[in-house]
Amino acid sequence: LHPIAPMIVESGPAQEMVRTGKDLLSGFGLDMIPVPISTPGFDNAPYLTSANWVTKDPDTGIYNVGNYRGQIKAPDRTGGLFLGQHMGMHWKKCQAKGIPLEAAIVIGVIPSIAYAATAKLPYDFDEYRLAGGLAGEPVPLIRCKTIDLMVPATAEIVIEGKISTEWIEPEGPFGEYPGYMGHRGIAPFLEVTCITHRKDAIYTTLMSQFPPSESSKIKHTGTEKVIYKLLRHDAGNPAVLDVAIHDEVSGSGQAYCVVKMKKTNSGDVWRALNSTAGFSGSYAKICIAVDEDIDIRDPAMINWAISYNVIPDKDVMVVKGKSPGLDPSCYPPGVPTHVSRQTPGSALLIDATRPWPYTPVSLPRKEFMERSKEIWEELGLPTLKPRMPWYGYSLGDWTQQDIEEAELAVKGDYWTTGEKAKAKRVKPT
């Protein structure tokens, strides 16, 4: 991937309509946007979920585009849960300078921006550049009307405003990625200065809450690739072949991560597991390494590897110091948000690679299964959707004698093998 810098344009459909001043309190503020309640019966307000927050470092000017939730609180005010993210670092820098943080919430963006905004990138890497690389062309940006920021010219809706660094206020509860309601906490808020939008703007949302969800799917797509790059390229571990995260068992893919490896030594495995556990805050609470024949997107195969490749007292490690994120097991009810964020968690590392060569997978060899499939299809039976392992294959512990005797068996000449066994009789001890 080669990042491509954005290009500045003079105008765009994102600013076909401009709402400022009294308009914001006369039916053309946040109340004109049809924001749904994501978890009816539990959420305390509508929340922006497909909100791509745009800010820039007040010292370097480098942009950050991140997807963070926002509680709608008034026609001209929304909350924002971002203090633990890169945008939160911008906020703290502005707080030290005694100035508000300018921000724009961009809704309805091209896919490359949406994917870039949900990927965990280095702090000083501009997501606009990643979006350009994904799209193969520069992202067109226009200047905001009331703040000094550049936003995507083709967006559906742009909410401009300033975030106080002097005050924070209650935010939440909201249905969150672990599959549980997030508690009420204290968070910053944005005071809207302008809303621009297309003439016939379409509001887009991400249904979040219990996984798998729209938000978990878009997040884990980018996260898999970022962790793969971290392990194979940044950490220089060529044994790493692929990475999968499982939102169907762990919420948004943050907690459960599986690494496929071409194992040559156990050192490469533990290096990969420790690097994965150290990735970005609360991600990868459970890290599992498996061999190259395991389908890392099939939970059944992963459990097979854990069940028969792992000696628990040798192949399992717990590492401390993980960020808890929104993991409810890390702190009891009633703990203030600013305290819970500092509560240390831990990670479980499992080496589920085979410790030595194993006998073949106990299914018929591939050619026999393929012939069975042909017969099945000739009979017009329902379409088969085989999943690995659907045929037997060698795992290293199989002798030439084993191969020859198996060939004799399928030819019907297993009597020969019986005679060999008879010739090698011994008395029991």
What residue spans do the PLM features occupy?
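Extended, highly charged
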Residues: L1-T429
